[in-house]
Amino acid sequence: STEKTPDGKAVHKRILPLNKEDEYCYYLELLGAAPSMEVFVNQEKIGDHTGSYTLYRVDVTDQIVNGDNELDIVCDSEVPCLDASLIVVGKHHFSLDHFGDAGLTVIPQEISTSSASIRITAHAKNLPEDAMISYTVLTTTGTMLANKSVPVSAPEYICHLTNPCLWNGKTSPKLYVVVAGLIVNGATEDQIVLPFGLRNLSMESNGSVLVNGLCVPEKDLIRTLESDPFVYDDMDEDGSFACVELKELCDIAADEEDCRNLLTEYVLQNAYHPSILCWKLPEDHADFAALLRELDSTRP
């Protein structure tokens, strides 16, 4: 249900029945709401977030109870919330607190038709020193192309592929899949599955974007800023091209630090999508270009 406060804010309310078990951790995930929101569980404020377009997670393990739980999301407008989910994970799990991303960073490097390098890094914390992370790279039909296990203390894996199939828009929207497993005492306790694509991006002096050396017509480039990550999933599979306009993120930020945080969240949450060809900043925020290059060096 939705109620309205005297100062014009909207309160989205829900009763969440739960069979709480002590061996699990519980996170609330919100795909997006108004420019700012506050989250209450059983009338206790547990977090707040600025940014309509970025996913937000908060640990609610200590606040929820066995039985009915009251969830209130207070927004500064009546814009409907996108999906809210309760994520249940074991005590040992990939990070759900790393800027709202998947807990896994996939950065293609040195891409050509003959070879490709992909830097893959999982994010985890509070794990035993002997914990391991296993990485497996597959085709979408399940053929294994590479695999390796690394210690959690050195989680980066540089994967090399020969003769890769490039993601080439609607001509060939070829995707790969990386599966990361968290291994503790010989058992896989958590797993992440993330699709990704391989393509070369560059930009000409006139502003035209090239994908694998071919110019993308302006009419084929969708200018967007999405809250729901499933939109980009569909574009990856369909072979559509997106130019992500970041102006609205900059406009809703309270200050420079808030703007940096919003941009970091959005880029890290969506950088693995091959359909996103470029990030576009407004001219009055061009000083954040260095931040975008630091977060994502693969796009022009």
Where do the protein language model's features map onto the residues?
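Active-site clefts of carbohydrate-active enzymes
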Residues: 249-254
